Swiss-Prot record:
Protein name per its UniProtKB record: Protein translocase subunit SecA
Name of the encoding gene: secA
Entry's cofactor comment: May bind 1 zinc ion per subunit.
Function: Part of the Sec protein translocase complex. Interacts with the SecYEG preprotein conducting channel. Has a central role in coupling the hydrolysis of ATP to the transfer of proteins into and across the cell membrane, serving both as a receptor for the preprotein-SecB complex and as an ATP-driven molecular motor driving the stepwise translocation of polypeptide chains across the membrane.
Bilayer topology annotation: Peripheral membrane protein
Length: 912
């Protein structure tokens, strides 16, 4: 109570902060008369003057008032739109690296031009991040007119661009693109073998549109680039056929966690079925020999029980397409990882694509935290303000609306079941349609949208459906959803992006009614003027009918998604209405709600078709949503805690790669590696302060031959007086150095340096890939340490550090071994041409994976890529190389073959 009283008297901290920005608005307004008097050339020349002032030592903050006034005047001339004062406040907030919460229709796209222009003046590049390719392309063209007028260059990153086109786009002053494109380009760059092939610029400043979607909703889904592994499609099909024979009594399904666990009876049934199929070994499902089968079984259970068609995914063109749970959009090209996608493919009977192994990964949290300054915009951020500050150190500032909000948000209506709810929804839609009020109906899934569509069709209510199946028509359907009497059923995808304009959209009506007319012709202008008049008249009729009616068919897990849906109505001071219709069948209430209390209310004197409207119910639902939000926040927080461990290691590896690529020669690094390896070999076989009789000479000979490529007279050396491990190590290193010196004498220095650099980069990448897989496996089981009264995250940090140290040792040994065994079978000058990058590299997003379909990249990942690097770092040694059982025992299946071929052992002398 006291807090509310203080806020009423003094205003909230947000109000005081916004008020503190008013003096800057006055300074901006002071420049307007001068700028308005300039001609176009003089106004455009402001950019050159600003850059000169920056070079002279002025700061961006000191330039802000005049720069913002310049953008406002340029937008007025080029777009016919003048920034409102509240939009100027939004621009200041973005420039300061904070989040501007602005309601739908307040012009966030135009707001971004202010901070983007100002921060592009130093010439270090500004990234504008959008949620889809359509918005990136649209905004780059639309707002690009303002930037180009002022002399700045604009690029856009979309799929299927070549590396050169991407470099050009990143080289522009301002670059538009999606969060996925920016993130994947960063990962791909750190898999290249030559600086010149990279596309990404150093991080400077980014503005993230729909910042809550990018930094919160997608924060649980790391970006992953991966390559294929062995084909196991037959096993997926066999296990799926077995899982389809289990009944509900055979497993327990936790909808909250999306986990499926076999009961004791279910385990016995599965064991019998697996044994009959010849897939069970050891007579026990959980025997060590069945580890792989158990993994496939768990994923098949999840695919068949926890993942629903037309809710979590759709089947299109014989492919499984994931549906984004927050936006309702198709995530074309992305795949679930860890075999889940393959299990769903087996479930639906479509072609099973091979599994993939992680080559590189990063979370959005750690990607965007690399920007020295980051700003964001959205219509819904206040509910997540704590998370934005905790993880990104960004404050949320609520920007006042330009005009008061007139939308009426009515209380929820609560029904016994879905049938009663749909009947009430149909009646409400019919009544709104009769009075000419447009209706936007929000659903939580494709399945629900199509179910409601069938219901309305039977009731002869004309409508349009917008979901992931018809995403190509998204902008068109949403833009016309505000026409007189229009009824649009949409999933969450209608919550962002294109504005719903009451009366209709001029651009889309022109495309519909006059597609053949050319812009600028008298016929086009006449048609546009006629339609513009019709839209104005229709808008008046819609306003008289009450504006846009937003009707929610159930509550989403997140309050933000509900608020986004409400926010489609009442833009720029227009009237509007919003109401949610709920039932006990709704997923949120069924899974997270207080079922007993709801059921008691439903059964108490409530007739069929009758609704309850109660603030208590709305409060209970909000409590359920807060519980889900808190759980999801904990998940995201945990993701970033664990990824921070990997991120520290990622930075080291990527910095090492950059240093290697920038260095003219890595001779010193390779020499140190050889010395460390020689010392490690001798130290492992000849402990300090021990006698020669105690040394493991056989292993010393074996490892020296395998790793260093030498066969010195160890027996003679050991017989010498005064020999000790230190002296022995010096002798071994001298022999190893002599082997390398002999190889170097056969080719020129430039070729040798290229070979060293290539071997080092390739080995680094190979072991980093294996390390990522190991960390992922560790991450899956580390929670079990809690049973031993240990903190999992601390245990993970400790184990990950130890694994990282072991990886560095393995890199040193493998680089030394490959260079010791490298052989040349053709003239060095014949190595000039480089192989193309393998085109099997695909991209994943976490449990979500996204494919790169560009196909024509210049960059490399698994080949040897570099402008002066030999094509083959090692020529095959032929069949005369013998792998003894002793050598084989020291090799992993993914180790490089010691014969010097440069191929993996399992594909060379270790092939079965």
């Amino acid at each position: 109570m006291l807090g509310g009283l203080a806020k009423a008297i003094f205003g909230s901290s947000n109000d005081r902060y916004v008020k503190s920005l008013r003096p800057i608005l006055q300074k901006i307004a002071g420049f307007e008369p001068t700028l308005e008097a300039m001609n176009d050339e003089e106004l455009a020349a402001q950019t050159v003057k600003f850059r000169q002032r920056l070079d002279a030592g002025e700061t961006l903050d000191s330039l802000l008032p005049e720069a913002f006034a310049t953008v406002r005047e340029a937008a007025r001339r080029v777009l016919g739109q003048r920034h409102y004062d509240v939009q100027m406040i939004g621009g200041i907030v973005l420039h300061r690296g904070e989040i501007a919460e602005m309601r739908t229709g307040e012009g966030k796209t135009l707001v971004a031009t202010l901070a983007v222009y100002l921060n592009a003046l130093p010439g270090e590049g500004v990234h504008v991040v959008t949620v889809n390719d359509y918005l990136a392309t649209r905004d780059a063209e639309w707002m690009g007119r303002v930037y180009r007028f002022l002399g700045l260059t604009v690029g856009v990153i979309v799929p299927n661009l070549s590396d050169q086109e991407r470099r050009d786009a990143y080289g522009a002053d301002i670059t538009y693109g999606t969060n996925n494109e920016f993130g994947f380009d960063y990962l791909r760059d750190n898999m290249k073998y030559d600086r010149a092939l990279m596309v990404h610029r150093p991080f400077n400043f980014a503005v993230v549109d729909e910042v809550d979607s990018v930094l919160i909703d997608e924060a649980r889904t790391p970006l992953i680039i991966s390559g294929p592994t062995d084909d196991k499609s037959e096993l997926y099909m066999q296990v799926d056929a077995i899982v389809k024979q289990v009944t509900k009594d055979d497993y327990e399904f936790d909808e909250k966690q999306r986990s499926v666990v076999l009961t004791e009876d279910g385990t016995e049934r599965i064991e019998r079925l697996l044994e009959a199929a010849g897939l069970l070994e050891g007579g026990n499902l959980y025997a060590y020999e069945n580890t792989q089968v158990v993994h496939h079984l768990n994923q098949a259970l999840r695919a068949n029980v926890a993942f629903k068609r037309d809710t979590d995914y759709i089947v299109k063109d014989e492919k499984i397409i994931i549906i984004d749970e927050f936006t309702g959009r198709m995530m074309d090209g992305r795949r679930w990882s860890d075999g889940l996608h393959q299990a769903v493919e087996a479930k639906e009977g479509v072609k099973i694509e091979p599994e993939n192994q992680t080559l590189a990964s990063i979370t959005f949290q750690n990607y965007f935290r690399m920007y020295p300054k980051l700003g964001g915009m959205t219509g819904t951020a206040a509910t997540e303000a704590h998370e934005f500050y905790q993880i990104y150190k960004m404050n949320v500032v609520t920007i006042p609306t330009n005009l008061p909000v007139k939308r009426i948000d009515q209380d929820d209506e609560f029904y016994k079941n879905m049938l009663d709810k749909f009947a009430a929804i149909t009646q409400a839609i019919r009544e709104a349609k009769e009075r000419g009020q447009p209706v936007l109906v929000g659903t939580v899934s494709i399945e629900k949208s199509e179910l409601l569509s069938e219901f309305l069709t039977k009731e002869k209510v004309e409508h349009k459906v917008l979901n992931a199946r018809y995403h190509e028509q998204e902008a068109h359907i949403v833009a016309q959803a505000g026409r007189l009497g229009a009824v649009t059923i949409a999933t969450n995808m209608a919550g962002r992006g294109t504005d719903i304009q009451l009366g209709g959209n001029l651009e889309f009506r022109m495309l519909d009614e006059h597609p053949a007319l050319e812009i600028g012709t008298p016929e086009f202008d006449a048609a546009a003027e006629r339609i513009r008049g019709e839209i104005i008249a229709e808008k008046e009729a819609v306003l008289a009918a009450g504006g846009l009616f937003v009707l929610g068919t159930e509550r989403h897990e997140s309050r933000r998604i509900d608020n986004q849906l409400r926010g489609r109505s009442g833009r720029q001071g227009d009237p509007g209405l919003s109401r949610f219709y709920l039932s006990l069948d709704d997923d949120l209430l069924r899974i997270f709600g207080p079922q007993t209390m709801f059921a008691r209310m439903m059964n108490k004197n409530l007739a069929d078709g009758e609704a309850i409207v109660s603030p208590w119910i709305s409060k209970a639902i909000e409590t359920a949503q807060k519980k889900v939000e808190a759980r999801n926040y904990d998940i995201r927080k945990q993701v970033v805690e664990y990824d921070d461990v990997m991120n520290d290691q990622r930075k080291v590896i990527y910095e090492q790669r950059a240093d290697i690529m920038d260095a003219e020669t890595v001779d010193d690094v390779v020499t140190d590696m050889r010395a460390d390896t020689a010392n490690a070999i001798v130290g492992g076989c000849c402990p300090p302060h021990s006698y020669p009789e105690q040394w493991d000479v056989d292993t010393l000979k074996l490892r020296s031959a395998e790793t260093l490529g030498i066969t010195p007279p160890f027996d003679e050396w050991i017989e010498q007086d005064g020999i000790d491990p230190e002296i022995l190590a010096e002798k071994v290193l001298a022999e190893a150095d002599a082997v390398i010196a002999a190889k170097r004498a056969t080719i020129d220095d430039q070729s040798w340096h290229g070979i060293e650099k290539s071997v080092l980069l390739q080995t680094l990448d190979h072991h980093w890939k294996e390390h990522l897989a190991t960390l992922d496996a560790l991450r899956q089981v580390i929670h079990l340490r809690a049973y031993a009264q240990k903190t999992p995250i601390n245990e993970y940090k400790h184990e990950a550090f130890a694994l990282f140290e072991r990886m560095l040792v393995a890199i040193r040994e493998e680089v030394t071994r490959v260079l010791a065994h490298v052989r040349f079978e053709m003239a060095p000058q014949d190595y000039a041409e480089l192989p193309p990058m393998p085109d099997f590299v695909t991209e994943h997003v976490n449990a979500l994976t996204g494919e790169d379909n560009s196909g024509d990249r210049d960059g490399g990942t698994l080949g040897i890529i570099g402008s002066r690097v030999p094509q083959a770092i090692a020529a095959p040694a032929g069949d005369d190389f013998e792998i003894t059982p002793e050598i084989a025992a020291t090799l992993g299946r993914n180790s490089l073959c010691p014969c010097g071929s440069g191929r993996k052992y399992k594909h060379c002398h270790g092939a079965l």
